[in-house]
Amino acid sequence: MSYVNELKSKHGGLTAHIVKTEKFKTVSLIFKMLAPLTKDQVTKRALLPHVLLRGTKSHPKTAGLRSYLDELYGTSVSADLTKKGERHVITFRLEIPNEKYLKDQTPLLEKGLQLLAELVFSPALEGDAFQSQYVAQEKRTLKQRIQAVYDDKMRYSNLRLIQEMCKNDPYALHVNGEIDDVDDITAEQLYETYQSAIQKDQLDLYVVGDVDSNQVQSAIDKYFKTEERTLGMIENNHADEKVQPKEVIDEEDVKQGKLNIGYRTSITYTDQDYPALQVFNGLFGGFSHSKLFINVREKASLAYYAASRIESFKGLLMVMSGIEVKNFEQAVSIIAEQFQAMKNGDFSEQDIAQTKAVIRNQVLETIDTAYGLSEFLYQQAAAQVEIPIEDFLANIENVTKEDIIKAGEKIQLDTTYFLKGTEGAS
């Protein structure tokens, strides 16, 4: 059974991924720009998509752009940022109603592709720079976005763990950049960053919906003019050397302690034992039937929440938990016990089957939405590999208990980070 009908084609420096499906009443256009993560560029790149969404050459005023979106039957457009290991990804999303369901015959798909191309390739400029008013306004918003991470202690403690684990790596950088670097960005500098990104980034466009592939490809050729580029090879930059575990404790005015523990897995998305790592994580802390949830949260009542997740491009496994400050030692100890139990193979065939079923359902739920489907496929484009969804699911299904234990042998404790409250914290 084939879950996805993905047609790939090259258009200059852009790879198009047309996913024909009758599942959705809308068509999703998802444009991605991927580049190395660097301290020098990350804050500018975080600002860039939000400035681009303010106006285009044809619609230089934001209000005019919004009313044009309304004319296209309420087409919506948004942007966000993610990290894939040591790479930074800018995503633009445009969702349009499928013209097949409209009474009149407006060529909405072509207009949507034209608008997306215009947002990315024909921005509103002042000379050789972005419009200074838009840059100033979006700089303020970006600072608020960065500050929001510091105000949300769950996200902040995760950031601090990564900063400590990956001190000398680009991965330590936050996806939105550094708050201290925002003020210095000029409209001219931002335009230089933009020009470099358009010329050098890996560009991928996903078109998901009930569409005609030939029509989409000719519209891409017409509107998305990009030059061919050489993409850098993807290096597995996970460390295989022996890790020296460390403990870092911060103190702030928080009521609930945040205990985050980071491990090095030495396994990334393209590795053969990645499916075994996924099952390992599912058994350890990925789901509500996992060891962390049952033993740390339910049985010992030590945590408000306890879960784990893997970073599939950097080779990390991270435990997140919220605990009473007084329970720090006990929580660290019981999490270590659960981790050791995993390494010892202290789980049944029934546990494995249950975990595989949950992973399978999770994947099928993900690809049941246009955005989830494009994200799943983009994991592969970013990693420069091709694994059909049916193969991905079969690889999970074929994982044995021995495979899980073997994957566990590679995992090493790296950093224990604790954010604890000051005395009398509210």
Curated annotation (Swiss-Prot):
Domain of life: Bacteria
Entries under InterPro entries matching the protein: Metalloenz_LuxS/M16, MPP/UQCRC_Complex, Peptidase_M16_C
MF terms (GO), sorted A to Z: metal ion binding
Keywords: Metal-binding, Zinc
Chain residues that bind Zn(2+): 50, 138
Family (UniProt): Belongs to the peptidase M16 family.
Protein name: Probable inactive metalloprotease YmfF
Origin species: Bacillus subtilis (strain 168)
